[in-house]
């Protein structure tokens, strides 16, 4: 099953996540099909907290990809911010 989930990056105590489309059997930070955005939970000031390619996210959801709980919340938040 294809899922849209977060892959952790960044450094210790400073997380940074990529929104990735991947096969659910792959490791969290392992192989992915496509990166469709990022989420920076510790962004401050002028830093961008969330960026999502809405067009690609809609495409993958249309193809049957299942978003994780957190990603579903982030996609809703990103759609609200662009509207």
Swiss-Prot record:
Family: Belongs to the bacterial ribosomal protein bS16 family.
Lineage: Bacteria, Pseudomonadati, Pseudomonadota, Gammaproteobacteria, Pseudomonadales
SS bond partners: none
Claim: Membrane is one of the keywords in the record: no
Record organism: Azotobacter vinelandii (strain DJ / ATCC BAA-1303)
Protein name, per record: Small ribosomal subunit protein bS16
InterPro entries, sorted: Ribosomal_bS16, Ribosomal_bS16_dom_sf
Keyword annotations from UniProtKB, A to Z: Ribonucleoprotein, Ribosomal protein
One annotated GO biological process: translation
SUPFAM superfamilies to which the protein is assigned, alphabetical: Ribosomal protein S16 (SSF54565)
UniProt entry tagged with the keyword Ribosomal protein: yes
Any one GO molecular-function label of the UniProt entry: structural constituent of ribosome
């Amino acid at each position: 099953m294809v899922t849209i989930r977060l892959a952790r990056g960044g450094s210790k105590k400073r997380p940074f996540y990529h929104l990735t489309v991947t096969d659910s059997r792959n490791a969290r930070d392992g192989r992915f099909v496509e990166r469709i955005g990022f989420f920076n939970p510790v962004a401050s000031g002028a830093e961008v907290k969330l960026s999502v390619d809405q067009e690609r996210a809609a495409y993958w959801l249309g193809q049957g990809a299942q978003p994780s709980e957190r990603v579903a919340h982030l996609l809703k938040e990103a759609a609200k911010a662009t509207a």
